[in-house]
């Protein structure tokens, strides 16, 4: 299912919050008074919302729950009478799918037979991921978000009847809401790298639909263009570890794409970039030795509660292309973001962490560890993504997560990776060349066959002539 939201805001907090959506056809007016605003790199806070509009978003604040390693979800209702489900918010896919059969990891599931508004489309659905899969049946039903816009829409729903390594024990969500573009709403999946078994503390955040809530961020919003409308693809132009440039060709950062994906836990980097980044992080944190398995995300490191030496780990800065020509901005994350806390049962008195930067074979993925602590605006109407520091941003005694700019960066368009395209004329040329090569190989064979046939005919004629002579004798 491809959502059609002009504006979506995801704000994932870094602390525990009190407990207090987005389908095909939802189109909401932007409550920000931006009709004539110029497209600048920064959007001053006083110009992007009409006075008195703050109350419009009160019901949407703190509507996200979840865990960093298991995804963040929003409460939704499906069917008539409404059935309440927790749905994972995923900006890296475009399908809307819910559990529709009993499963050991589900406390509840969508029961189609109890909905008077369910319509069966009589189509099967099969979606494989790098790890795991699910399959089910496609239909439509009425959907709404209680802590969201006051809108009920009919949406396409994939009812999951069978799955393998898709639902996560203890995650508390029963379905997935893909908020990316229609181009990737194919019935297959590229990857679903959430963690299946680790227990972590619950945190919360907000998903605001239709505008911007200024109470949830500090400073200015900085926007980067959406390069292509499939995933939320952006362009990274520079990477620094503790202020030291990795000095790589910027195309390496975006090979074969760079996306913002709330459905992925880690910051995932292409192989060359990952190796360079880990080397720099190791050098910066050399006062302590860590096992190789830690850097590969396979082992935990633990310290006595309250004694984690955050200061030995470097900050990581990603520079993103800005909206103004030759200008970029940077987002800086702290080790409190890329060292993900994990509750280790065996050593519950310790603070244990997992390295949340991993290697990728499908480009850079800015996952939940990047988005946590930032206010992220998915502005589909203007084809851009905004970043600001959240109101509960990550910080320690000396450092804080930041969004800063502008920085002069020429030729940023060259940093984007372009998949080689082979046009039809090239394919036809290749086909003709192959046909000519085949003809050259076949010609000698044909000549040999013809020669053999001729010799056989001549021999047959000679034998007949010999028989005639013997009869005359």
UniProtKB/Swiss-Prot annotation:
Glycosylation site residues: 150, 169, 195, 326
Keyword annotations of the record: Acetylation, Aspartyl protease, Cell membrane, Cell projection, Cytoplasmic vesicle, Disulfide bond, Endoplasmic reticulum, Endosome, Glycoprotein, Golgi apparatus, Hydrolase, Isopeptide bond, Lipoprotein, Lysosome, Membrane, Palmitate, Phosphoprotein, Protease, Signal, Transmembrane, Transmembrane helix, Ubl conjugation, Zymogen
Disulphide linkage map: 188-392, 250-415, 302-352
Membrane-traversing stretches: 430-450
UniProt note on regulation of activity: Inhibited by RTN3 and RTN4.
Subcellular location: Cell membrane; Golgi apparatus, trans-Golgi network; Endoplasmic reticulum; Endosome
Residue ranges of domain Peptidase A1 in the record: 72-388
Extracellular side: 22-429
Positions of crosslink type Glycyl lysine isopeptide (Lys-Gly) (interchain with G-Cter in ubiquitin): 473
Keyword Cell membrane: yes
BP-aspect Gene Ontology terms: amyloid-beta metabolic process; membrane protein ectodomain proteolysis; proteolysis
Region (Interaction with RTN3): 451-473
E.C. number(s) listed in UniProt: 3.4.23.46
Topological type in the membrane: Single-pass type I membrane protein
GO MF annotation, one: aspartic-type endopeptidase activity
Function: Responsible for the proteolytic processing of the amyloid precursor protein (APP). Cleaves at the N-terminus of the A-beta peptide sequence, between residues 671 and 672 of APP, leads to the generation and extracellular release of beta-cleaved soluble APP, and a corresponding cell-associated C-terminal fragment which is later released by gamma-secretase. Cleaves CHL1.
Family stated for the protein in its record: Belongs to the peptidase A1 family.
Quaternary context: Monomer. Interacts (via DXXLL motif) with GGA1, GGA2 and GGA3 (via their VHS domain); the interaction highly increases when BACE1 is phosphorylated at Ser-470. Interacts with RTN1; RTN2; RTN3 and RTN4; the interaction leads to inhibition of amyloid precursor protein processing. Interacts with SNX6. Interacts with PCSK9. Interacts with NAT8 and NAT8B. Interacts with BIN1. Interacts (via extracellular domain) with ADAM10 (via extracellular domain). Interacts with SORL1; this interaction may affect binding with APP and hence reduce APP cleavage. Interacts with NRDC AND NRG1.
Protein name (record): Beta-secretase 1
Lineage, broadest ranks: Eukaryota, Metazoa, Chordata, Craniata, Vertebrata
């Amino acid at each position: 299912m491809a959502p059609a939201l002009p504006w979506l805001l995801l704000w994932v907090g870094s602390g525990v919050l009190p407990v207090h959506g987005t389908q095909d056809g939802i189109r909401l007016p932007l409550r920000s008074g931006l009709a004539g605003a110029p497209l600048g790199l920064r959007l001053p806070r006083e110009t992007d919302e009409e006075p008195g509009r703050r109350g419009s978003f009160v019901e949407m604040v703190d509507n996200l729950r979840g865990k960093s390693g298991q995804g963040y979800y929003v409460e939704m209702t499906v069917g008539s009478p409404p059935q309440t489900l927790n749905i994972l918010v995923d900006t890296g896919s475009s399908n809307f799918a819910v559990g529709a059969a009993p499963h050991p990891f589900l406390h509840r599931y969508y029961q189609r037979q109890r909905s008077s508004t369910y319509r069966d489309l009589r189509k099967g659905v099969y979606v494989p991921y790098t790890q795991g899969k699910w399959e089910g049946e496609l239909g439509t039903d009425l959907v709404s978000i209680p802590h969201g816009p006051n809108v009920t829409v009919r949406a396409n729903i994939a009812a999951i009847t069978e799955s393998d390594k898709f639902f996560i024990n203890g995650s508390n969500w029963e379905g997935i809401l893909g908020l990316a573009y229609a181009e990737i709403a194919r019935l297959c999946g590229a990857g679903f790298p959430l963690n299946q078994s680790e227990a972590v503390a619950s945190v919360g955040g907000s998903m605001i639909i239709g505008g911007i809530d200024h109470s949830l961020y500090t400073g200015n919003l900085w926007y980067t263009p959406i390069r292509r409308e499939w995933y939320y693809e952006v362009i990274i132009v520079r990477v620094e570890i503790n202020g030291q440039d990795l000095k790589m060709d910027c195309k390496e950062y975006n090979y074969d794409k760079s996306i913002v994906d709330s459905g992925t836990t880690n910051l995932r980097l292409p192989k060359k970039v990952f190796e360079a980044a880990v080397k720099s992080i190791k050098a910066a944190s050399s006062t302590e030795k860590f096992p190789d398995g830690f850097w590969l995300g396979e082992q935990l490191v633990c310290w006595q509660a309250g004694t984690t030496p955050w200061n030995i780990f470097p900050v990581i800065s990603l520079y993103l292309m800005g909206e103004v020509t030759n200008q970029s901005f940077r987002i800086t994350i702290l080790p409190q973001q890329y060292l993900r806390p994990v509750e280790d049962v065996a050593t519950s008195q310790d603070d244990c962490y997992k390295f949340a930067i991993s290697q990728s074979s499908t480009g850079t993925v800015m996952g939940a560890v990047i988005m946590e602590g930032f206010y992220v605006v998915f502005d589909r109407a203007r084809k851009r993504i905004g970043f600001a520091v959240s109101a509960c941003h990550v910080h320690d005694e000396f450092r804080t997560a930041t969004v800063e700019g502008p920085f002069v960066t020429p030729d940023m368009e060259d940093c984007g990776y372009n998949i080689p395209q082979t046009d039809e004329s090239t394919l036809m040329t290749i086909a003709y060349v192959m046909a000519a090569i085949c003809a050259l190989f076949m010609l000698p064979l044909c000549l040999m066959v013809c020669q053999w046939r001729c010799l056989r005919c001549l021999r047959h004629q000679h034998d007949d002539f010999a028989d005639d002579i013997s009869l005359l004798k």
